[in-house]
Amino acid sequence: MRNDPVISARTLIGVPFRLHGRAPDLGLDCVGLVVVAYGLSENVPTGYSLRSRDLAHWERVIRAQGFVRRHAGWRRGDLLLVRPGPAQIHLGVWTGDSLIHADAGLGRIVETPGI
């Protein structure tokens, strides 16, 4: 059984943002946050940019990790795939009332109330 992803993600709050980062001591991006929080190790994407329009690609990547798509009724510990801008796709860990994610603008992992 995997560790609680919310507890794991909260330990990462404040870790510096680093594109393609996979190690908390060096920095994480949103994919790295998900890799660490959910304890993933196989088929982890690389070579992507901060901008992407290919939502279908990211949905396939997420399904390949065993996650199930849900449009509403999110639960604590769910992985959220969101589109914060027209050319941006983002991942985060839903706590039940906030989203833990890698914020490139703020330069670190943060917890944002609501969504």
Describe each model-derived feature in a short phrase.
Residues 3-6, 43-109, 113-114:
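...with weaker cross-activation on analogous glycine-rich loops/strands in unrelated enzymes
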Residues 10-14, 21-22:
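A glycine-biased structural micro-motif
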Residues 16-19, 69:
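Short secondary-structure junctions and interdomain/linker hinges
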Residues 17, 23, 28, 88, ...:
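Short glycine- and Lys/Arg-enriched binding-loop motifs that mark or flank ligand-binding interfaces
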Residues 18-21, 44-46:
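Surface-exposed patches in mature extracellular/periplasmic domains of secreted proteins
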Residues 22-41:
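Active-site nucleophilic cysteine motif
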